[in-house]
């Protein structure tokens, strides 16, 4: 049985590492549209605890997860889990 790795995305929130396909900055217009489309379709998960959104994670199930942790920090956590 394979063990799924959990990655901390801030404030006690975790995501399965194998399900994440992208970590992006929320500042661009396409990412703002992605967030609004996900909200309208019920695919948005807000893990910011009311703080500013600093990164957007996209999963293989097309869910969009908002995090208040910088994309670089989250990618470092992925790299640590991978042993890179």
UniProtKB/Swiss-Prot annotation:
Name of the protein in question: Putative regulatory protein Ddes_1405
Protein family (similarity comment): Belongs to the RemA family.
InterPro entries xref list: RemA-like
Cysteines joined through disulfide linkages: none
Organism: Desulfovibrio desulfuricans (strain ATCC 27774 / DSM 6949 / MB)
Source domain of life: Bacteria
